[in-house]
């Protein structure tokens, strides 16, 4: 009987220990997976507030001493360079086009591509945006897309600017690499510098003298837009090829006065009929991209 009692006590103690251990495990699991920790998991997760070299604090001489006059001087100069309004940059990919011939001059929009551009123009019109600037890539498919969109929105065609920096290209070797698309290193070297220059030309926080939110429309290309999205949101730029955007889609990025960047739309084509949703060469047709 004593042996049985000892065995029962030992078993009970073991089960109690096991139960208490398992009871505490969920708390540890929740703590380890808690995503609201103030300490970033990786230094890359930290936001660079001076990404455009226009952080107000970087534009003003720092305080030299503790005197009130010096502090007043600093505050006065800082106030003069602080932006008050946001910049909205809306990026449109060209419509579907015919990949015929070896030169850009023969790469015209398909009939569906022209209809895609018209749907996009109507959608932009519905949004009621008053455009400050409209800029288009100099490639034929982007020019044709922009021209169709301009028929639908309130903006004078004579004011449109053309920019060769926005032409399609290979921005940076993607990660992970893909087997079906391997440009030469020289192409990345050449195109990458140009596309990065385009990003720096169009992406920056508002200047202090900007009196209202501004809206810029850029009509360009898939690779360029995807690279811009990664750079603007401070994602690894090598990740650009992981993103897919449809023809004539709308991507909307906002740069707030603080320099923070947010994305409102990414490749939006929800306003188009299903049979107009394309992003690459259709199976039923050759030489169309």
Swiss-Prot record:
Bilayer-crossing regions: 7-23
Keyword field: Hydrolase, Membrane, Mitochondrion, Mitochondrion outer membrane, Transmembrane, Transmembrane helix
Catalysed reactions, semicolon-separated: O-phospho-L-seryl-[protein] + H2O = L-seryl-[protein] + phosphate; O-phospho-L-threonyl-[protein] + H2O = L-threonyl-[protein] + phosphate
EC number, UniProt record: 3.1.3.16
GO biological process, one term: positive regulation of mitochondrial fission
SUPFAM superfamilies (UniProt xref): Phosphoglycerate mutase-like
Membrane topology according to the record: Single-pass membrane protein
Keyword Acyltransferase: no
Name assigned to this protein: Serine/threonine-protein phosphatase Pgam5, mitochondrial
Organism: Drosophila persimilis (Fruit fly)
């Amino acid at each position: 009987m004593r042996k049985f009692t000892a065995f029962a006590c030992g078993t009970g103690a073991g089960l109690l220990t096991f139960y208490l251990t398992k009871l505490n495990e969920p708390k540890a699991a929740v703590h380890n997976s808690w995503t609201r920790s103030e300490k970033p998991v990786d230094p890359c997760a930290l936001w660079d507030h001076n990404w455009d070299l226009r952080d107000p604090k970087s534009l003003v001489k720092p305080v030299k001493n503790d005197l009130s006059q010096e502090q007043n001087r600093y505050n006065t100069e800082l106030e003069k360079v602080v932006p008050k309004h946001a910049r909205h940059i809306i990026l449109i990919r060209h419509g579907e086009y015919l990949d015929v011939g070896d030169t850009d001059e023969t790469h015209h929009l398909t009939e569906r591509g022209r209809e895609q551009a018209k749907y996009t123009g109507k959608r932009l019109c519905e949004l009621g945006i008053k455009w400050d600037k409209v800029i288009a890539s100099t490639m034929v498919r982007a020019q044709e897309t922009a021209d169709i969109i301009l028929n639908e929105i309130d903006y004078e065609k004579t004011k449109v600017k053309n920019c060769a920096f926005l032409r399609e290209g290979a921005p940076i070797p993607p990660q992970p690499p893909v087997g079906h698309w391997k440009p030469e290193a020289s192409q990345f070297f050449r195109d990458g510098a140009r596309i990065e220059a385009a990003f720096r030309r169009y992406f920056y926080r508002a200047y202090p003298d900007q009196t209202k939110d501004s809206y810029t429309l850029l009509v360009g290309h898939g690779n360029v837009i995807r690279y811009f999205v990664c750079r603007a949101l401070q994602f690894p730029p090598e990740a650009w090829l992981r993103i897919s955007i449809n023809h004539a889609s709308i991507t909307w990025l906002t740069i707030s006065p603080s320099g923070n960047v947010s994305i409102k739309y990414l490749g939006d084509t929800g306003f188009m009929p299903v049979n107009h949703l394309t992003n690459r060469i259709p199976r039923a047709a050759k030489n169309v991209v």
